[in-house]
């Protein structure tokens, strides 16, 4: 099952209530604390990391620079600096720190 982190949290609850926990591979998108914890404990198979705090910080810096200097920063993709292209797995989950609770 693939979906946003919040949806995968619901799938975890539904599978658990149905007595089918662990019967599906769960892959989220967002990099929430719930996702990172789920990948760590094996409840989730993987997650595609999102970095909303980092993105917001970079955006604000670029905006202030543009206002002060009139210079555009161009496209900024914080995902290019993420380990393993942002794919969180059991093998690399320790490289990621959630930026939101989810």
Predicted regions located by residue number:
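Short, charged, surface-exposed secondary-structure boundary motifs
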Residues: 35-39, 56-59
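Sec-exported extracytoplasmic/periplasmic mature domains
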Residues: 12-20, 40-44, 64-68
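Structural detector of well-ordered beta-strand residues that form the stable sheet scaffold
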Residues: 25-27, 45, 88
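Hydrophobic alpha-helical
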Residues: 1-37
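Hinge/cleft segment of the Venus flytrap/periplasmic-binding protein
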Residues: 51-102
């Amino acid at each position: 099952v693939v979906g946003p982190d919040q949806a995968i949290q619901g799938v975890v609850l539904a599978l658990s209530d149905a007595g089918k926990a662990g019967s599906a591979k769960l892959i989220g998108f967002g990099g929430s604390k719930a996702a990172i914890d789920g990948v760590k404990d094996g409840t989730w198979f993987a997650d595609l990391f999102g970095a909303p705090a980092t993105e917001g910080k970079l955006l604000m810096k670029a905006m202030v620079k543009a206002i002060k200097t009139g210079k555009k920063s161009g496209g900024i993709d914080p995902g290019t600096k993420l380990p393993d292209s942002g794919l969180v797995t059991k093998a690399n989950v320790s490289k990621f720190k959630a930026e939101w609770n989810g």
